Amino acid sequence: MPDPRTFREPAPGTSRVTIRDVARAAKVSVSTVSHALNDTGTLSRDTRERVAATAAELGYQAHPMARGLRGGHSGVIGLSIRALDDTGTYRADGAHHFERIAGAAAVAALESAFGLMLIPYPAGPSLERVALWADGYIIEDPVSSDPLVTHLQNANIPLVTVGWDPSRKSKTAWVSTDGRRHTTEVLELLRGRGARQVTFISGTERNSWNMQSEAAYRAWARDHGVKPQLIRLPAASGSAGGQSAVATLLKNSRTPDAFYCQTGRHAAGAARALLDAGLEVPRDVLIVAGSDAEECRTSPTPITALDLRPEHLGREAVELLVSIVESRQVKRQRLIEPLLHLRASTER
């Protein structure tokens, strides 16, 4: 066994010994210490005893929340909304979708005797601490091979995603809309109203929503013999990003018959660029948004949009996670039907 005395213990009056201190002294990972002290996982008896002895000699005491987990449940669900972290602010304009998910999830958690805690999307070393305190996690819009999903799976922590991780759709529990099918339905709506060349404005994040919708757009363009015209913009670019991208497109190429924008803010920006160019919606160009937002409803010409029903997504995610935490046998992959709000931007 490594001699714990080679590790410098905190002096009296300083911060207490942490699980990381134990891991360094025992020359194992933080997750190994957690499994050893909580009698979980598949560690050998020798490893468990070695870690326990190191912890005892250092005087390590588990954090109260970790002790709660050792005896059962903490009664807490963690919610990480990756898309908000990607914007760099939690007060982003157009964040209503995520606020609606979080609000509905909080109420649903309380109804199941759990508390909901919003956490920043962890990265780097902070991943090691994530799995120690919550009974389970909800991750909104994970990207392909998402490191947080990987970390929680490796730690055997229950998780549900809103939208699936594209690299392991069949291996995780999720609630989601069917981006591929609904994108095709919107494109057919536009085609039925006279649009042949449709420009698609998607996000840059490699999540299931963007990837499925883009795949559907390319397939639709191929099936109808039209050249795809795809613009990718970061969601954080908002209305200004949509306005700038469409203004540039109008200067450099033929005006398309319609725009299908993944986000409501991009759609609102596209509408402003069309207006600035002397074009009228819907007379000259049709617009649809793939996610309804206040900007769609208050645009000078209200914009047709898919309502992804974020409250329903939030409630379903909590219900599914609680079922998994409580070891109930339930369907672990659930599709939610969005609603299409027809507005003036597609009236012909």
Predicted regions and their residues:
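N-terminal helix-turn-helix DNA-binding module of bacterial transcription factors
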Residues: 1-76, 347
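Flexible loop/turn connectors
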Residues: 2-6, 12, 229, 252-348
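Short acidic/polar active-site loop segments enriched in Thr and Asp
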Residues: 29, 75, 135, 196-197, ...
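Hinge/beta->alpha junction and helix N-cap segments in small-molecule ligand-binding domains
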Residues: 84-88, 92-97, 121-125, 175-185, ...
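Short, well-structured alpha-helical segments in soluble
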Residues: 123-133, 242-254
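Flexible loop/hinge segments that line or gate small-molecule binding clefts
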Residues: 143-184, 265, 291-303
